[in-house]
């Protein structure tokens, strides 16, 4: 285990994959590379997994054939681990977690996210697929809040990724499976712990989504993450959590309590070193709230594109700006676009000295 953790840190890998019949594989800047060419056998993989686990994680893995946990090593830092069984054989994926919480400037995040971190109340959802950096961005937002305000921040995570020290705020971090039985059990008791800010590691069910909305409705600021590719998909996914009879009420609750959605992807840097965050920002202006209340999700992206002066931007606009700034290649900008044709056209307009036009819509962070 020591050698594996050391290799992850030395190569600055984001992930490590351990599976029977293949060499240990690292993901570095989004590209897979193997450590040697010697495939691992079943015993080697099983022994490696056991070496990373606490007694409780070993018991959970034996009972459920799945285990998610964190590794906290004094020399090699923190790792998020997911052990599983595939085709009857053990497997493990490790994700490296930076020891220090990066700030907004280091991450290249839009300035409006500082305003979102300091909101008094409401719901802020960070959206993205696995490995897109949304947990890191959320940790940066919480750290900014922690350093620039006073209050009580409670996080419920599975597992805890970034460890927050007490700065201006008191920070309580609870890990599912270690400090609490489940998200739902922890969230049912959270309001009794007098929080000002609540962070839910991931929304996976209707019940967890209801808790997030309830926290916002009762005057708290709630952050959470959700697996989706963009803001529109995230809204559709929230709708899919609930039966048809509840969906109108869900749209109403979202329209009243949602303050922002931030969707993120990580693209290869044009320099060949590292990756670049590309961020879509949806802010709850009066018009956005009206569309959400009516369930008119299909109208939201166009409005986002016309509201850039207020801090909103679509993925395609963010891709174009990253390309114009020399951060990503033209090929990657087009490949990752929601509308490749629109991005291709705007790149041509830029190269010919023209700019795409935007209209503004009033928005003020409360």
What is the role of each PLM region?
Residues 1-366:
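Short, flexible helix-loop junctions that flank or precede catalytic/ligand sites
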């Amino acid at each position: 285990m020591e050698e594996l953790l050391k290799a992850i840190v030395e190569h600055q890998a984001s992930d490590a994959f351990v599976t029977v019949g293949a060499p240990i594989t690292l993901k570095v800047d989004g590209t897979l590379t193997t450590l040697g060419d010697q495939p691992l056998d079943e015993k080697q993989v099983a022994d490696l997994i056991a070496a990373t686990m606490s007694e409780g994680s070993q018991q959970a893995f034996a009972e459920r054939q799945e285990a998610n946990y964190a590794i906290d090593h004094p020399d090699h830092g923190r790792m998020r681990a997911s052990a599983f069984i595939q085709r009857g054989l053990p497997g493990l994926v490790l994700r490296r977690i930076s020891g220090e919480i990066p700030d907004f400037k280091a991450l290249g995040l839009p300035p409006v996210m500082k305003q979102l971190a300091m909101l008094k109340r409401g719901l802020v959802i960070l959206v993205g697929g696995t490995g897109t950096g949304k947990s890191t961005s959320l940790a940066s937002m919480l750290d900014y809040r922690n350093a620039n305000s006073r209050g009580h921040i409670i996080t419920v995570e599975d597992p805890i990724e970034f460890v927050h020290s007490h700065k201006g705020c008191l920070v309580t971090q609870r890990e599912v499976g270690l400090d609490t039985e489940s998200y739902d059990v922890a969230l049912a008791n959270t309001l009794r712990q007098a929080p000002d800010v609540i962070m839910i590691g991931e929304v996976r069910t209707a019940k967890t989504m209801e808790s997030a909305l309830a926290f916002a409705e009762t005057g708290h600021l709630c952050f959470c993450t959700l697996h989706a590719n963009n803001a529109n998909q995230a809204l559709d996914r929230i709708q899919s959590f609930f039966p048809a009879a509840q969906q109108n009420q869900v749209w109403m609750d979202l329209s009243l309590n949602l303050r922002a959605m931030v969707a993120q992807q990580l693209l290869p840097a044009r320099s060949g070193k590292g990756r670049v965050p590309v961020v879509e920002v949806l802010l709850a202006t009066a018009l956005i709230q009206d569309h959400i209340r009516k369930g008119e999700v299909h109208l939201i992206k166009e409005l986002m594109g016309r509201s850039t002066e207020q801090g909103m931007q679509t993925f395609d606009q963010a891709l174009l700006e990253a390309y114009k700034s020399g951060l990503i290649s033209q090929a990657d900008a087009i490949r990752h676009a929601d509308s490749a044709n629109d991005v291709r056209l705007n790149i041509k307009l830029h190269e010919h000295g023209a700019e795409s036009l935007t209209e503004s819509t009033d928005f003020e962070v409360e």
